[in-house]
């Protein structure tokens, strides 16, 4: 779970950089929007993005011509936040498990022998499934932001971030 937590921190940084590159609209990160849906991961992500973008000259506000950004930008708090919440749940379950007895049978302090099912892996299997889903969602939205970055039809940047295409293929295989 340590690597997953670090990945989520870096994902917020990548999300903020995407906002900068695309002159993202900052209103989707305003605190008022997130306090009315107080999911802890969502709140934390919105706060992180606000902090990372503080003082940026490369973001913008909504206008009549451009009311909102695509999901990959404006839903960063909801997507990253849900993954943060899932990973926090997994971390809690792992901490319980590594501090538990999973022997069978167990012998109490009083010498009483009890056969049971504490050896069963389901209490870890389900959280690890959640972990896989959480990381997959981060990968999915990250890939979509990369596509937006290298596709000149979706950004104001040259295709594959190459100024002079030809022999130089830039980020064609990202």
Where are these regions (language model features)?
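C-terminal catalytic subdomain
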Residues: 122-174
């Amino acid at each position: 779970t340590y690597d997953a937590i670090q990945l989520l921190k870096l994902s917020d940084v990548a999300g903020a950089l995407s906002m900068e590159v695309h002159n993202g609209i900052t209103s989707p990160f305003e605190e008022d929007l997130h306090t009315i849906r107080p999911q802890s991961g969502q709140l934390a992500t919105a706060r992180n993005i606000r902090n990372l973008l503080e003082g940026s000259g490369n973001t913008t506000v909504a206008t009549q011509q451009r009311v909102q950004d695509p999901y990959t930008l404006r839903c960063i708090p909801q997507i990253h936040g849900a993954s943060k919440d899932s990973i926090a749940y997994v971390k809690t379950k792992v901490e319980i498990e590594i501090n538990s007895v999973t022997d069978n049978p167990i012998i109490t302090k009083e010498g009483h022998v009890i056969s049971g099912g504490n050896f069963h892996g389901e209490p870890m299997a389900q959280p690890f499934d959640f972990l896989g889903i959480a990381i997959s969602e981060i990968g999915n939205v990250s890939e979509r932001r990369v596509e937006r970055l290298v596709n000149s039809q979706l950004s104001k940047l040259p295709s594959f971030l190459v100024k002079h295409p030809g022999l130089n293929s830039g980020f064609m295989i990202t």
